[in-house]
Amino acid sequence: MPAADTCVRNARLADASAISRITEGYAGEGIMLKRSVENIIEHIRDFFVADYKGQVIGCCAIAFYTVKLAEIRSLAVLEEFRNKGIGRLLVEKAEAVLSEEGVNEVFVLTLNSGFFKRMGYKEIEKEYFPQKIWRDCTNCPKRMACDEIAMVKTL
C-alpha cells in the first residue's frame, strides 16, 4: 500500500520539476491553474511533497492570509497513486504545520468537495475570503464563471 511507504516532507528545490509535472496534469484538465517551474521555485518553501520510495508522487502548498487564516492549495497526486490515501497524508501534514503556526482556520477552493468533506471541511461562500479573491481570483481566467467550491475547517 503506497500510503504506508510514503513520507510527506518539505519540498526541496530539486523537487520543483516533479511538482510542475504533477500539477501540470491537473491544469490540463482545468482542475487547477498552471504554475510555472519558476513560480514553484519562488514558492518552494510553501510546498510539501509525498515521497514514495524516492519518487515525488504528490504535492500541496500552503498560503497564509492572516496570522489565523491560511489556504491549502495546489493539492495534486499522480494519477496512478490517486485514491490510495496520499492526498489525505498531504492535507494532514499541511494542517499540522498550520496548527503549529497558530492558524486556527484553513480553507480550500476545490472541485472535489467530497474529499474535503470527509476531512472535516464545510462549504462556505467564497465571499468569506476577500483576501483570496483580491490576491488570486482577479487574475484567474475562470473568475467570471468560477466553478470551485469554497470550504473551511477550524483546526
From Swiss-Prot:
Gene Ontology BP term (one): L-arginine biosynthetic process
Top-level taxon: Bacteria
Keyword flag Isomerase: no
Family annotation (InterPro entries): Acyl_CoA_acyltransferase (IPR016181), GNAT_dom (IPR000182), NH2A_AcTrfase (IPR010167)
Key words of the record: Acyltransferase, Transferase
GO MF, any single term: L-glutamate N-acetyltransferase activity
Record EC number: 2.3.1.-
SUPFAM superfamilies given in the database record: Acyl-CoA N-acyltransferases (Nat)
The keyword Acyltransferase is assigned to this record: yes
Any GO CC annotation of this UniProt entry: cytoplasm
Enzyme's top EC category: transferase
Domain spans labelled N-acetyltransferase: 6-155
CDD domains associated with the record: NAT_SF
Family, as annotated: Belongs to the acetyltransferase family.
NCBIfam families: PRK07757.1 (NF005840)
PANTHER family: AMINO-ACID ACETYLTRANSFERASE (PTHR30602), AMINO-ACID ACETYLTRANSFERASE NAGS1, CHLOROPLASTIC-RELATED (PTHR30602:SF12)
Name recorded for this polypeptide: Uncharacterized N-acetyltransferase CT2212
Protein's organism: Chlorobaculum tepidum (strain ATCC 49652 / DSM 12025 / NBRC 103806 / TLS) (Chlorobium tepidum)
